[in-house]
Amino acid sequence: MKDSVILVLINKKTGEKKVIKGENIITTAGDTYYAQKACGESPTNNFSQLYLCTAGPTTPAKDDDYSDFTVSGGTNNPKSPESGYPKTNDNDSDNTGAGVGITSWKYAYAITDGPFTSITHWFISKAGASGTDPILNSYKCPSAWDKDASSEAKVFVNHQNLGS
């Protein structure tokens, strides 16, 4: 699978918009999840929640799991996806990685969510994940970022099955 992530931070006081883009890796458990969904089966893991983290692997890998990360504190972490997600052909104009054959997950953080400081990694897992629970994907930000009480944020996680 080819995959990308996009973070959009919007300062509600100044109107400034900051966009951070990068690549993430689908884990082995994530490959299984997508295969089961494609076959109409109930997935072994009910991946849905986005976990923001202050530390994680130097290089994301196929075998990463919950224990490889330091999950951040803050209100609404982990976060459920926006209603209607995941979906294909996302029409949110901030999701520049969307497309017909791309599965997009969207997570929106309001001013009241957080605060989150020094976020360097994130992943999608099940609600209440802990220990060595499996994760769908593993992502390392190109640089740390903060979300304070004057900011909203949108996180898009995009996955494209390349068929190879």
Segment roles from a protein language model:
Residues 1-120, 126-164:
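Small cysteine-rich, disulfide-bonded extracellular modules of the LU/uPAR three-finger superfamily
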